[in-house]
Design a protein with these regions (language model features):
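Membrane-proximal alpha-helical signals and transmembrane carboxylates
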Residues: 2-10, 14-218
Length: 218
């Protein structure tokens, strides 16, 4: 085999170990898709001892099954997500998470640990959309949305209509991280939970020095 052929094989072998997050976060580690719980929304709330993490799939089997929702409390997001693996037979896969929803209390304490988790975790993606729930907890909102369809379906509908809404702009974890690195300030779409259990746009959460300091109308 020519030298170039060997180089291609070596690159193929070592790229998954190189930390190329953007390229390989979609690979499900050779597991069968049927044996995996593909989480699409992650919610993080503040507790007295650390955080509560709520993970939800979308609606399943073309609407025939409600979303699967898992919840764990731990001292860190990574510990809570790891504990979820013991809740069922399916492997909990976070590589399909498209939305990260933060409760207001957690956001006021600081959003940086949640963003750092996304940045460092091998499955999570930097293009994940970021939201702050105004006046409530992310986990409760995810549970309420599941009574209608799922948080994933509702947020994806808002994201698709973002160009048509004057009070809603998509923001990714990567974009907010870049803002914080450059000037310490940023803004994140705010949501409220409507009476019908639907997530609704509520302007923007204003972030200063990595923490929620107030709200702005869209």
């Amino acid at each position: 085999m020519r030298r170039s052929g060997w180089m291609v094989l070596l690159l193929a072998a070592f790229l998954p170990l190189s930390g190329c997050k953007e390229t390989f976060d979609f690979l499900p580690y050779a597991r069968e898709i049927e044996d995996m719980a593909l989480m699409r929304t992650l919610g993080v709330d503040l507790t007295a001892e650390g955080v509560r993490v709520t993970a939800s799939t979308g609606i399943q089997d073309q609407g025939a099954k409600p979303p699967t929702i898992l919840e764990e409390e731990a001292r860190s997001i990574s510990a809570a997500c790891l504990s979820m693996q013991a809740q069922g037979a399916a492997y909990v896969f976070y590589g399909h998470v498209g939305q990260l929803l933060l409760g207001e209390d957690l956001a006021r304490q600081g959003i940086r640990p949640a963003l750092d988790y996304v940045m460092r975790d091998i499955e999570m993606r930097l293009e994940t959309k970021l939201y702050v729930l105004q006046g409530g907890e992310a986990g409760a909102a995810i549970q309420a949305a599941a009574q209608e369809d799922s948080a994933a379906e509702q947020l994806e509908a808002l994201e698709a209509d973002a160009g048509l809404l004057s009070d809603f702009m998509n923001r990714t974890v990567e974009e907010v991280l870049e803002d914080l690195e450059e000037n310490g300030d940023s803004f994140v779409p705010a949501l409220t939970l409507g009476e019908n259990g639907r997530l609704e746009p509520a302007g923007y959460a204003l972030i200063q020095d990595g923490a929620l300091v107030g709200w702005a109308q869209g």
